[in-house]
Amino acid sequence: VNIDSYTKFNEDGSNQEVKENLTVRRFHAKYHNEVAILKIGIVDKTFADRLLLGFMGGYEYKQTQNASTMDWVYGARYTTANTLMPQLTYEKRFKVLKGLHVSLNGNYNFGKSYSADTASCNYNWLGQSQPKGVPGELSYMKYRYRDHNGAANFRMALFPADGQSVSLSSTLTTFSRSGKDETAYKPTYEHPSQ
């Protein structure tokens, strides 16, 4: 990464901006993603040309090196995500007129995500850190998300004659997210004594 300035951490705890053109190496930008997909089903049966049940499971780990601008440098922020998604695929061709083709595809994700910013220090582009009195490089958090999103698509195509087709398609999508910051202040209410 080419930078034109960086924050120098002095031994007395002070900071100063150094204007210098440097090429530095990213030190906190790892990314890891793995996915396993399993599909099982039947083909060429009287009730279905193709009927598949599937499952996709995935895991992602991503370190965050900088904010949307290069001015904010991070050295410990990261996110993780898990994907658990069942899937269904159905296709059938009927011998009506020149053909009727029906298909249904659907999936639903039961995902979880986690974002963490817990380091009690600041970093510069040289990979050096300086302790600070409060946790969080940007804002202290241990945020857990639950994502539930799904999609279903139904398509029906009719071929009344050569070179002609009529099709109908409908798609349904759904999304919901809930989250909780494990570091958030949780006030307790005490009932006043009588």
For the regions a language model picked out, list residue spans one by one.
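Periplasmic-side early beta-strands and strand-to-turn transitions of outer-membrane beta-barrels
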Residues: 1-75
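Short, Lys/Arg-enriched charge-dense amphipathic segments
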Residues: 13-20, 25, 72-81, 124-130, ...
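Face-selective signature of the C-terminal outer-membrane beta-barrel domain
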Residues: 39-59, 81-194
